[in-house]
């Protein structure tokens, strides 16, 4: 039996100020799935994501990644297994060169020498950025920096790739290039986004989180075609966009 990449069971969480962000979330993501996490601002999406690699803990319920519980004793391995790509790549890139940024995670985990170099080269090749290895990240375009940010996570060979608004601030060509890269990866993907057409393009399954609970879970095309569901959870497609017209 194949172990799920992610299992969230009865997850509830309140912040120290008393704000209850999650109310008993249950979610299973199978290995290799690409799932869009949708919902309005304040729905609890960020709170859920921060539980996946143990940045937030102490609530009710449980989270397991490939069968390993997210717990203090396992945090080093959990953070290798769950790679988060932030919305702003400049929050993730801080070394003098692209190569050093991509090497940072594996090196911090103890990898050295030819093994480390091979890991860096592989990650950069997967995102089409190998030729920029010796460039300073701040000399790259925004789209290129986002691809390098993805490479920094891929260098850790994660079980799950979590992407926060991956299409934001990308021009059409960069958006297409990133989509092609994400489709090529043999990794479980959880994509947090307000870009509903991008979710439809990349993720066969979508989950709507609203007011701290899972409000809907199913094929992305079906959910986005349900006008009543979309209105109820403050989700809107671009003017004139018909999800049923998209050939998947």
Feature locations, PLM:
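Conserved beta-strand-loop-alpha-helix hinge in the C-terminal portion
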Residues: 213-235
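Conserved ABC transporter NBD signature motif
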Residues: 61-69, 78
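Conserved ABC ATPase signature
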Residues: 136-140, 144
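Conserved ABC ATPase "signature" region
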Residues: 114-132
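H-loop/switch region of ABC-family ATPase nucleotide-binding domains
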Residues: 193-194
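The feature captures the beta-strand-to-loop junction immediately N-terminal to the Walker
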Residues: 38-40
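Helix-to-loop junction immediately C-terminal to a conserved catalytic motif
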Residues: 53
